[in-house]
Amino acid sequence: MHYNIILLVDGTLSLEQANQVEQKHQKLLEKATEFKSEYLGLKELAYPIKKQLSAHYYRWSFHGESNCTKEFKRAANINKQIIRELIINREKDYGYLGSVNPKKQQLSLQKLTKYNEIIASENNPDNPDAPVTSGLASVKPRLSRVEKQKERELEKWTVVHQSGNFDTVQINPYRPRIKRFLQNNQQTSQANNNQPRFQNQFKKGAKP
């Protein structure tokens, strides 16, 4: 099978140190043949990945068996100096198996788009140091539940300030949590009103 791999190595390392990391992981490819390695340069990332702002880019091309990248992927995932890797199996992703599987077609297209844009940025002589904005570094980091909530609140108040109408921000009574809260308040009020003490006070006109 024909493989292409894009490897991102920690940009704070010197070129010599990055080459050592790259060569160390080359040896983990089992029985790889026709191996070609190309250094694409030190590039700025679109956003921090593992607290790094830049990375050394490498492109590998080789042939091997279907499980030849298994050990490489395991080592790359636990090595902090490897920021990210993109593995493309040309035959599996773009061959017959990929052509009959819609999900694999979509995933393969995403991988190919990332791969082509990384190569295109390398082949741009006018601006070779331009940051990669839609390649491996373009995937938006996953937000936590609290961060998502803050993001929604920020979007809501942005709309309010732009429109200038603060009355448009209302509680949605159909949201499960708000609905339970309103029901509990209603039940509490009814229970208080049904107590004899409250009924007698209301009859006499006294304040509760």
From Swiss-Prot:
Disulfide bonds: none
GO molecular function: small ribosomal subunit rRNA binding; structural constituent of ribosome
Matching InterPro entries: Ribosomal_bS6, Ribosomal_bS6_CS, Ribosomal_bS6_sf, Ribosomal_S6_plastid/chlpt, Transl_elong_EF1B/ribsomal_bS6
Keyword Cytoplasm: no
Biased composition (Low complexity): 185-195
A GO biological-process term: translation
SUPFAM superfamilies for this protein: Ribosomal protein S6
Keyword terms, alphabetized: Ribonucleoprotein, Ribosomal protein, RNA-binding, rRNA-binding
Superkingdom of origin: Bacteria
GO cellular component: cytoplasm; ribonucleoprotein complex; ribosome
Region (Disordered): 121-143, 185-208
One Pfam family in the UniProt entry: Ribosomal_S6
Functional summary from the UniProt entry: Binds together with bS18 to 16S ribosomal RNA.
Family classification: Belongs to the bacterial ribosomal protein bS6 family.
PANTHER family associated with the record: MITOCHONDRIAL 28S RIBOSOMAL PROTEIN S6, SMALL RIBOSOMAL SUBUNIT PROTEIN BS6M
Name this polypeptide is given: Small ribosomal subunit protein bS6
Gene name linked to the record: rpsF
